Amino acid sequence: AYKFTGIDSSSQPSMDEMKQGAIHLPMALAHQGIVVVASRSHQTEETTAFIDNLRKQGKPVTLISSGSSLKICLVAEGSADIYPRFAPTMEWDTAAGHAIAKSAGCDIYHIDGKTPLRYNKEDLHNPWFIVK
């Protein structure tokens, strides 16, 4: 996966031209402690407890609030370390971001942190999950 910058939307550059200025993901970013990305509109008690548990481990925690599947992409690019989701989502809410995350070497797991998220289930609801 790549992060593209400086692309003029009025031009139609080729993929080779775009890749010249692209940054391969994940980017190597130095963080102080753990950077957590969470939902602006779906902050739950479980999310707060998850973040509090990270803080109890003795590392400083920085919280970034963001909307939509951008949260998955922030982990994929290296701007955030982890994204816990303790609120309802559907497969279509996560599929595109999941593809980007996997290409960048990250993945989406059930909240246990071990079982990969699966698609094309009979019930299209996602379980609570974590991106890392």
What are these regions (language model features)?
Residues A1-I72, P116, K121-K132:
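Acidic beta-strand-loop-alpha-helix segment within the catalytic core
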Residues V36, L74-A76, A96-K102:
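Hydrophobic residues within well-ordered alpha-helices
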Residues F50-N53, G78, G97-H98:
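Short, glycine/charged-enriched secondary-structure capping and boundary segments
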Residues K56, S79-D81, A101:
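Glycine-enriched alpha-helix->loop->beta-strand junction motifs that scaffold or abut catalytic
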Residues E77-I82, G105-D107:
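Alpha-to-beta junction loops
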Residues R85, H110-I111:
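Short beta-strand and adjacent tight-turn residues that come in two discontinuous sequence segments
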Residues W92:
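Acidic donor-binding loop at a coil-to-helix junction in glycosyltransferase catalytic cores
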